[in-house]
Amino acid sequence: MTDTWDQETDVVVLGTGAAGLTAALVARSEGASVAVYEKAPTVGGTTAVSGGIVWIPAHNRAAGGELTVADALKYLEAQSLGVMDRELVETFVRTGPTMLDYVEAHSALQFEVAEGFPDYKPELPGGQPGGGRSLNAKPFDQAAVGEWASRITSFPIDFSNVGIDAETRARIHAAVDDMDGDYCVAGTALIAGLLKGLLDLGVTPVTEARAVELIGSASGITGVRITLGGKDIRVKANKAVILGTGGFEWDQRLVEAYLRGPLRGPVSPPNNTGDGLRMAMAHGADLANMGEAWWVPVIQIPGDTLGGKPRSRSVRLERTRPRSIIVNRAGKRFLNEAGEYNSMSGPFHQLDPRAGYVNDPAWIVFDAQHLKQYGFLGIEPGGVAPDWFNESATLADLEAKTGIDADGLAATLTAWNDAVAQEIDPEFGRGASAYDGYWGDNSAPTPALQTLGPLDTPPYYAVPVGIGAMGTKGGPRTDRDGRVLHVSGEPIPGLFAAGNAMAGVTGRAYGGAGGTLGPAMVFGYRAGLAAASR
C-alpha cells in the first residue's frame, strides 16, 4: 500500500530542548527543510529550567591556560568505571569547540566562560580545579523572540531549586536590571537564543504535538505519526527523523525496569516519559547505559506537587554549607555531603542483602545556627522553621519524630564536631576537593571551613532527602553522528537521536557543570549535519 502523508519535510525534529533545537538549527542552516514538534504546550524542555551551562572540555576560550583533548579524555576515563564509549567521547571532546562556533554564528545564542567553576572531580588526572571548561549562556533579551518569550518552559520555581543563595540572587538581578531590555538568563537564555535563530530561518515549532509512532520499514524511517489537536497526522521525513524527546524519568514503569536503584523524584518537567525510547525500541534500536541517570539529591516538601505528583527540589547549598550533615536511619553519615551530586547515587543506592537500602531513607540534619546564618531551601537566614523541618530540642525528640537512632546520631555528632575542630573529615574527605567549597560559605577563613562546621546549637532539624534525577542517561545507542543503531549494530536509516533521548556517551561520568547540555548540543549539532546531508 502506498503511504499517504498529511505533511512533508526533509528533517523532522522531535523535542525543543538544547539537543532538538541545535539539531534543527543546523539542519536548516545546511539547506534542509525542517519541521519541529514539541509534546508540551511550551518549548525548551529540561534545558529551559536548567542553569544553561555547557561543559565543553577542550574549547579554546579559557583564560590562563590551554584546555587539551588529551587532558579531557584522561579526566573522563578516570571516572568512567570502564562504562564509556571511547570513540563517542573523543568525538564529543573534539567537536565541542566547532559546535560552539557554529551555533554562535547561526543563532542569537552566545556563550561566556564560567570562570572559576571547577570540574566536578577536579583532583582526578586531567581535572581542572580552577575551572574553565564550563560556559554560560549569556543573558538574552526576550523581546527578540516576541510572543515566544512567554512560551518557553518554566516552573513555579524559586532560586532555591537551582542552589542560588540570596547574595548571588541579588547580583544576578542587579546585573540584569542594569541591561536595557527584558533579559533572561540561564536555561531560558540558552533556549531563547537558539529559538531566535530558528525563527529567523523560517522554522516555527509546533507545540502540543506528541509523536507516537515512527513510520518505516526494514529500509529505514520515512516519517512519524503525531497526535495534534485531537487527531493523528502523518509527517513524511524525506531525509531523517531526529529524536530530542528527553529521557524517561517520569515513567514509573520504565524507571523500575531500568534504573539501578530507587528514584525519589525527577527535577525535570513531567513530559519526559520515554516517548522517543519506545518509538526507537519498536524499530529494533539497541540500548545502552539504561541503568544510569543524571543523579541529584532532592527534597520533597509536603503538599508541594507538580503535575499531580510530589515536586522534587534539588539541594546544593543546604548540604554544602557548614553545620549540616546527611545521615541514615542509624544516625550515621555515609557520604561527602559537599561532593558533586551525580556520584551521590552510589551511597544512596547501597544495598544490603538483609537490610535493603541502608541509606534510604536519609535526612539532612542541621542546627539552629545553620538556619540563622544560611537559611534553608528558600527560607531566608533567620527565618521561621516550617513544621516539615522536624524541629527538636533534643536528639531523643528527633528520633521520636523521624526514626533516626538518637544514640547513633549522638555518636556521629561527637565524632563530627571533634573532626571539624581540626578542619578535616577523616571518613569521607569533605572539604578536601576544590569543588567541595564552591557552593559553601565564601566568607570562611579557610577553604575547609567553607563546608565544615560543628552541629552544636539546638534546636536540631531533620529534613528527609533522597536521590532524584535531572534526567535519565540511557537510551538508543548511536554512532558518532547520532545515527541510532539497530540491535544488529548497523544504523537504522533515517533515524537519529541526541541529548537524553540517546544513550549518554560519557557512561557514568559527569565531567562538570553543563555535563548534560554539552554532549546534548554536540550530538544535536552532528545529527543535524548528518541528517541534512542524506
Residue ranges and their predicted role:
Residues D6, L25-V26, A35, I233-A240, ...:
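C-terminal structured subdomain/cap of oxidoreductase catalytic cores
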Residues V93-G229, Q300, V420-A448:
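Conserved redox-cofactor binding core of oxidoreductases
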Residues W5-G17, A35:
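Beta1/beta-strand and adjacent pyrophosphate-binding region of the FAD-binding site
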Residues I56-F92, T153:
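Glycine-rich active-site loop/strand segments that organize a redox cofactor
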Residues E213, S217-G220, G408-V505, A509:
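A glycine-rich dinucleotide-binding beta-alpha-beta segment and adjacent secondary-structure elements
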Residues P122, G126-G130, P139-A166, L277-M279, ...:
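An anion/pyrophosphate-binding glycine-rich loop and adjacent beta-alpha core
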Residues G181-T188, G229-D304, L351, L517, ...:
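Glycine-rich loop(s) and the adjacent beta-strand/alpha-helix scaffold that form part
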Residues S29-A48:
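Glycine-rich FAD pyrophosphate-binding loop
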